Amino acid sequence: MKGLAAALLVLCTVALCSCAQVGTKKEFCCLVYTSRQIPQKFIVDYSETSPQCTKPGVILLSKKRRQICADPNKKWVQKYISDLKLNA
């Protein structure tokens, strides 16, 4: 049951967030942020969006290699980034 709930959460999150590619490099912009906090155990890496984007964002990478756009001003996003930097 927990596995099904986690999978459903990830699928809903992916459906709620969008990324748009900018230019010829693999730079993405977040058009919409995820509305829910993703469990930290699913996040393995992150990247910041390009300064050319109209909206700042953090792209979280899940264990299943899914990209999730998150608001860089949210406390939980800042904590995940800090923890990922410490464990790098």
UniProtKB/Swiss-Prot annotation:
Entry's Gene Ontology BP terms: antimicrobial humoral immune response mediated by antimicrobial peptide; cell chemotaxis; chemokine-mediated signaling pathway; inflammatory response; positive regulation of cell migration
Name of the molecule in the record: C-C motif chemokine 18
Family annotation (PANTHER family): C-C MOTIF CHEMOKINE 18 (PTHR12015:SF94), SMALL INDUCIBLE CYTOKINE A (PTHR12015)
Free-text function comment from the UniProt entry: Chemotactic factor that attracts lymphocytes but not monocytes or granulocytes. May be involved in B-cell migration into B-cell follicles in lymph nodes. Attracts naive T-lymphocytes toward dendritic cells and activated macrophages in lymph nodes, has chemotactic activity for naive T-cells, CD4+ and CD8+ T-cells and thus may play a role in both humoral and cell-mediated immunity responses.
Keyword terms, alphabetized: Chemotaxis, Cytokine, Disulfide bond, Inflammatory response, Secreted, Signal
Gene Ontology molecular function: any one: chemokine activity
Lineage of the species this protein comes from: Eukaryota, Metazoa, Chordata, Craniata, Vertebrata
GO CC annotations on file: extracellular space
Post-translational modifications reported in the UniProt record: The Cys-29/Cys-53 disulfide bond is required for activity.
